[in-house]
Regions:
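Conserved motor-coupling elements within RecA-like helicase/translocase cores
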Residues: 391-411, 428-429
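Conserved hydrophobic packing residues within short motifs/helices of P-loop NTPase cores
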Residues: 360-362, 466
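Signature of the SF2 helicase/ATPase Hel1-core->accessory helical subdomain module
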Residues: 150-154, 162, 192-212, 419-425, ...
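Conserved helicase motor
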Residues: 366, 386-397, 415-420
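ATP-dependent helicase/translocase motor core
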Residues: 2-10, 14-358, 367, 371-383, ...
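Structural recognition of the conserved hydrophobic beta-strand(s) that form the central parallel beta-sheet
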Residues: 182, 411-414, 464-469
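Hydrophobic positions in the central parallel beta-sheet of the AAA+
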Residues: 361, 411-413, 437
Length: 488
């Protein structure tokens, strides 16, 4: 007789086996003791954490050293900041010790492990996610699955998770969780207003969780990371979950397909290179003040069009294309995309071209300049708002200008502030600057016969120009894609 819930045999177990295709290790936790094998306050596994940290940093830390670091992480996770303090450490390290090697796409330094039904406990309260994804022993993500054709399952699970994440007793677990996946292994029904069926992902939140669909656009490059299922590993997963009897059944074989909805989103989000990219560039915190003067923090994860736009920009830059249009971004997604690319392109130009990137967000209305300024500052950028043409002339003719805040600067400017005089000059210093122009609403105000576009093009002939629009114009003499070509 088969044991467990229907979603175990139809969704969870096939998903666990699929993770092994991606190079993850399945670990049984039947013999793992809380506060012996892992820290019960954070669910960080000592052995995986210690081994990975030593490999990454070429150190010989002891178990006690590792526990001290975890203790410091615990203090950060106690903050009422949705894990922002912890995230900074995840990105940059702590006391000179890196917790993740973001360049290790082969998995020789980082540790990639999945477990099932790991208790998230605080006193008498607990919950056990179906699949927990451990990166270097840290539970950075988890997956909840429901049986197929259960139209209320996803909404019910979201409500349940919102109650848990809003409960202060789970604050540390909310902070360490970077994003979650919820799936009932059905295809999306695009007629549904609410996320009723399909596989969705969301960043952690104290309040409402926003579920996003994921539609893969780069399947071929992900196939290269796919491995064959090892029979012994598959049987270990099945026997560890008391479901060895389902092996070979039509339902199990079908659910094991790499093309199932659950397995597709796992491939898209958890392939090693993709996951490292998301953890490095795909997550941001937005801090705002509400009408009552209370500071609110939101955690955002890239929507899939923003992810693929960023990868397209990278690919085109490597091909030597220095200007292009991103045509499918809409609303506030454009500022979010620009923010993510500030982080990404800062590293890209530093590592691949040895240049210091300098960023400009160009709008065609004063109200949009103020709006963009607020959006970028809320995400943590230092913003320089150009007030007049003279200020821009000073800015663009001073390649060595920098700030001492430690933050990357985004210069926000109205297109009308470009003039014949605002042209770059060679540096008097040994500074190789790469200017990057983000052009908001690129279907407006950039007539190829007008002076605005001419002044923009002349300001820096070597600038990278990324035009953002939801409605590219195509017509006689005015074709957005002819001006900037096509990035994505």
């Amino acid at each position: 007789m088969l044991m467990g819930r229907p979603e175990d045999s139809r969704v969870k177990i096939p998903a666990l086996v699929h993770f092994t295709r991606l190079g993850y290790t399945y670990m049984s936790i039947k013999d793992k003791e809380c506060n012996v094998d892992y820290d019960g306050d954070t669910n960080i596994f000592y052995s995986q954490f210690l081994s990975a940290v030593n490999r990454i940093n070429q150190t010989e830390l002891t178990l006690e050293d590792a526990k001290k670091i975890i203790g410091e992480l615990k203090i950060k996770l106690d903050n009422d900041d949705l894990g922002k303090s912890f995230f900074k450490i995840l990105q940059s390290g702590i006391d000179g010790i890196k917790l993740i090697d973001f360049s290790d796409i082969t998995g020789t330094k980082n540790d990639y492990t999945v477990v099932t039904e790991l208790p998230y406990e605080n006193g008498d309260d607990n919950f056990r996610p179906d699949i927990v994804v451990l990166i270097n022993g840290m539970p950075l993500s988890f997956i909840e699955v429901k049986r197929q054709n259960n139209r209320e399952g996803i909404l019910t699970e979201r409500s349940r998770m919102e109650r848990r994440f809003g409960n202060k007793i789970y604050r540390r677990f909310v902070g360490i969780t970077q994003f979650t996946v919820f799936s009932n292994n059905n295809e999306y029904d695009d007629s549904d207003i609410e996320p009723i069926q399909g596989a969705f992902y969301a960043s952690s939140s104290y309040k409402r969780m926003f579920f996003s669909k994921f539609r893969e656009q780069r399947e071929d490059e992900l196939k290269a990371d796919m491995q064959s299922i090892v029979t012994e590993t598959e049987e270990f997963v099945l026997s560890d979950n008391n479901l060895i009897a389902i092996k070979g059944t039509p339902e199990y074989v079908s659910s094991l397909s790499e093309k199932s909805p659950t397995n597709r989103i796992i491939t898209s989000l958890y392939t090693k290179e993709r996951l490292l990219f998301l953890l490095k560039y795909g997550i941001c915190y937005k801090t705002t003040t509400n009408k009552d003067g209370i500071t609110e923090i939101e955690k955002h994860i890239m929507r899939y069009p923003q992810l693929f736009a960023t990868l397209a920009i990278r690919d085109k830059l490597r091909e030597g294309v220095r200007k292009g249009v991103i045509w499918h971004t809409q609303g506030s997604g454009k500022t979010a995309l620009a923010y993510s690319n500030v982080q990404f392109l800062t590293d890209y130009f530093s590592k691949e071209e040895g240049k210091i990137a300098k960023f400009y967000f160009i709008v065609d209305r004063l109200d949009l300049a103020e709006q963009a300024k607020n959006e970028f500052e809320a995400r943590g950028l230092k913003v320089k708002l150009i007030k007049d043409k003279e200020a821009f002339i000073t800015d663009i003719t001073n390649p060595g200008e920098s700030n001492t805040s430690g933050k990357v600067t985004m210069t926000v400017i109205n297109i009308q502030k470009f003039s014949k005089e605002s042209v770059t000059k060679p540096s008097d210093y040994n500074v190789d600057v790469q200017r990057v122009y983000f052009l908001d609403e690129a279907h407006r105000s950039y007539n190829p016969t007008g002076s605005f576009l001419a002044n923009l093009m002349a300001s820096d002939r070597d600038a990278v120009q990324i035009a953002l629009t939801g409605t590219p114009l195509i017509g006689d003499g005015y074709n957005t894609k002819m001006i900037w070509k096509l990035y994505s």
